[in-house]
Amino acid sequence: MTRHFLDLSAMTATDLRTIIDDARVRKSATKAGTAEKPLAGKMLAMIFEKPSTRTRVSFDVGMRQLGGETLFLSGTEMQLGRAETIGDTAKVLSRYVDAIMIRTTDHRRLLEMAEHATVPVINGLTDDTHPCQIMADILTFEEHRGPVKGKTIAWTGDGNNVLHSLIEGSARFGYRMNMAVPLGSEPHDKFLNWARNNGAEVLLSHEAEQAVAGAHCVVTDTWISMNQEHRARGHNVFQPYQVNGALMKHAAPDALFMHCLPAHRGEEVTDEVIDGPQSVVFDEAENRLHAQKSILAWCMGAV
């Protein structure tokens, strides 16, 4: 059976834990110069319909560190789903490469790719979810604070794709998920309902202080995601959800701060917080590399 990595909800808790534990080992081996290359001779196709820095570099470097190679394919060059159906593209690519990573807008394009591909398909990001980011976040949290199970993670800001995957992660990893968003920016009900139906404790409010109270980790993201540049910046409904020193005082004394980057300093987070001692954003960015190496290895049967 082909191993896809599409969403945390599509994975078992056991498989996700296996990937996190493997990432920890691979990271240590990389630092020690003893890392193995289990994907030697393998080729990863990377399809980008949305631009990226971290996703492209981390998958490219990660695949190379595992001994494999990558092929970059831009959405404009491929005309995915226009000149050729996504299903046909998936079938053709499956004859050439050993895995496909796609970063796209419409989540349905990811699912259609996986439906027709005979090689693993990995979700590099869609407008709905961003599971690779949450794997990096869990790895980072546990490096600094130990097991995430039973801890409280708080989100403040927009109800976007990263939050959707954090919500799914709460059911799979066993952490409590608090979130505060402005009216009209709530996460999609299907993610909340799925998490609650799978045993997660999730709290949705519109008060940042309420969500952050006692939290072990505070997470935010840009208020303006790609394709949302029409929304006003700065002085808008998101201002009360800014992560600043005053808000962090409501969290646990040793709470971590996370942000998937890029950050708009002075908007969703202040310099005081992102550059402060509680911030682990650059560890988090590095761990995209290590978490995704283990996702790649798991998908291709090397874990």
UniProtKB/Swiss-Prot annotation:
Chain sites annotated for binding L-ornithine: N161, D221, S225, M226
EC number of this enzyme: 2.1.3.3
Binding site for carbamoyl phosphate: S52, T53, R54, T55, Q79, R103, H130, P131, C132, Q133, C260, L261, R288
Localization terms from the record: Cytoplasm
GO MF term set: amino acid binding; ornithine carbamoyltransferase activity
Function comment: Reversibly catalyzes the transfer of the carbamoyl group from carbamoyl phosphate (CP) to the N(epsilon) atom of ornithine (ORN) to produce L-citrulline.
Name of the featured protein: Ornithine carbamoyltransferase
Pathway: Amino-acid biosynthesis; L-arginine biosynthesis; L-arginine from L-ornithine and carbamoyl phosphate: step 1/3
Protein origin, superkingdom: Bacteria
GO cellular component: cytoplasm
Gene: argF
Gene source species: Rhizobium meliloti (strain 1021) (Ensifer meliloti)
InterPro entries in the record: Asp/Orn_carbamoyltranf_P-bd, Asp/Orn_carbamoylTrfase, Asp/Orn_carbamoylTrfase_sf, Asp_carbamoyltransf_Asp/Orn-bd, Orn/put_carbamltrans, OTCase_ArgI
GO-annotated biological processes: arginine biosynthetic process via ornithine; citrulline biosynthetic process; L-arginine biosynthetic process
Catalytic activity line of the entry: carbamoyl phosphate + L-ornithine = L-citrulline + phosphate + H(+)
One Pfam entry name: OTCace
Family that this chain belongs to: Belongs to the aspartate/ornithine carbamoyltransferase superfamily. OTCase family.
UniProtKB keywords: Amino-acid biosynthesis, Arginine biosynthesis, Cytoplasm, Transferase
